[in-house]
Amino acid sequence: MARAASGRLAGRTILITGASQGLGRAVALACAREGANLLLVARRAGPLEEARAEAESLGARAIAVAADVGDASEVERVAAAALDAFERVDVLVNNASELGPTPMPYLIDTDPDALRRVLEVNLHGPFLLTRALLGPMLAAGSGSVVNVSSDAGVVGYPGWGAYGVSKAASDQMTRIWASELEDTGVRVNSVDPGDMATAMHAAALPEDDPAELARPEDRTAVFVYLASAESAGVTGRRFEAAAFPVPGAEPAHAQ
């Protein structure tokens, strides 16, 4: 199917990691409805292909690349595939996340290899992918990088050690990227999507009733905003998706 000819993201190319399910898939479909080209990345090829097909059914041009963003060589392959297919990426959404072992152990009981794996996916991968795609953004004088955050990176919840440390570091990396890229036209922000009915939330907090949690598709408005021209000049900020009012509106709350 031909891609959508109009929309707030028409003509923009967006790369989304962790796009096979949950928030990543919901953001991909929201961007597809707004006319974006998509490059979708996730580890599992089957669900990723389903997400790609669904995006194309909405009129988007969508390409799927099965890869593990916690592996530096695979990050290089993703970046090469993106630049080969689209020449440049306008928007990067670093959404892929690794929770770590469950039930979630206290730091004193955390295996060092498990901590390393969480940091590779949640911090090292986004750093490498951002760096790999930054050149064409700088040459064009525009671009948007969105890192998915969590309140576990702000509050010291017991048992959330590996994940919380990775998200705290990700927020700081967002601020530093934004400062270093000031006045280049490339903006870097983070979004805390809040509690949602996702597989990751179920793994972390199996006692929670998913019917009482937000759906991922209800938390996509801020991502479309940050991917669009409406957010030009907005950088170095931390948004709470639950507080973002309507598509295209100014955020109700940002930090």
Annotate each predicted stretch with a short phrase.
Residues 135, 178-180:
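Alpha-helical segment proximal to the catalytic Tyr-Lys
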Residues 103-107, 111-116:
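Substrate-binding pocket helix/loop in short-chain dehydrogenase/reductase
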Residues 130, 166:
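Active-site helix of classical SDR
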Residues 150:
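Residue(s) in the substrate-gating loop at a strand-loop-helix junction
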Residues 46, 66-78, 112:
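The beta1-alpha1 cofactor-binding region of Rossmann-like NAD(H)/NADP(H)-dependent oxidoreductases
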Residues 183-184, 190-193, 198, 207-253:
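C-terminal helical subdomain
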Residues 20-21:
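Conserved glycine-rich cofactor-binding loop
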